Curated annotation (Swiss-Prot):
SUPFAM superfamilies: Trm112p-like. Disulfide bonds: none annotated. The lineage of its organism: Bacteria, Pseudomonadati, Pseudomonadota, Alphaproteobacteria, Hyphomicrobiales. It comes from Rhizobium meliloti (strain 1021) (Ensifer meliloti). This is UPF0434 protein R03186. Pfam families: Trm112p (PF03966). InterPro entries: Trm112-like. GO terms for cellular component: cytosol. Belongs to the UPF0434 family.
Length: 62
């Protein structure tokens, strides 16, 4: 995978919020996901596009 393709634009990260909680997201570069700690969900990034659908998000387990 191209390393540059997996990076998230910091300006985009400032604008995006969790669709469930409207809270901030953090980027997990290892999993290539946007994480909502409050909702305990991780939204995938596919081909450089964040998939901001709760139905597509992975539940974060402890």
């Amino acid at each position: 995978m191209d390393i540059n393709a997996s990076k998230v634009d910091p300006k985009l990260l400032e604008l995006l919020v969790c669709p469930l909680t409207k809270g901030r997201l953090s980027y997990d570069p290892e999993a290539n996901e946007l994480v909502s700690e409050k909702a305990r969900l991780a939204y995938p990034i596919r081909d450089g596009v964040p998939i901001m659908l709760v139905s597509e998000a992975r539940k974060i387990e402890d």
